[in-house]
Amino acid sequence: VFVSVPRVYEKVLARVQASLRSSALVREIERTRDDLDRSHRLLSAKQAELESELQSAADFVRAQLPLPGMPAPGVSMQWAYQPSLALGGDLFQVSAWGSETLGLYILDASGHGVAAALRAVALMSFLREDNLAKAVGSFDPGAIITEANRRFPLTQDGEYFTLWVGRLHLPSRTLSYAAAGHSGAFLHSLQGDSQWL
């Protein structure tokens, strides 16, 4: 039997090289798996942080809403607030605008999520009593909507607000209101009559 040494040497060398490549590939796969595990842990931690921040923002927006009950003698208010996401651009408020007037508004910033909520809170800040006195000079619903439209126009990205503003004069029980794209509010009288405004 004749055995060629160079041939055996080439086979052994090829097997050793294949084994080394396999070992290197195994080490590379293990490193990649470790990197993926580390990335997954980081992403999970970041997701938990973002969800916590989103919940905190949703809690802040909810805290801006009025409390159910009687904002003024003889005026009862009930509401349910259920945004489609944890956070959205729908807000409303009832607050004193002077000693004899209640201001009411319902607003909706287009879109959903954080961006819509931030735009809604910006408009809500504009609608505060002290700001309206300076910016508009009155609590007239039409004038308020006109100024809101000037300050918060339709953007190039298509972002917009719909808004309903009401003013209830308490001594006379007179409600005046204006709407800009919003369907309005629901009024229920003591006599049991209900109507959309």
State the predicted function of each range.
Residues Q17-D34:
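The C-terminal output helix
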Residues F2-V3:
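Two-component signal transduction core modules
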Residues P6-V16, L20:
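C-terminal output helix
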Residues R38-L197:
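… and, occasionally, acidic/histidine-rich disordered N-termini of signaling adaptors
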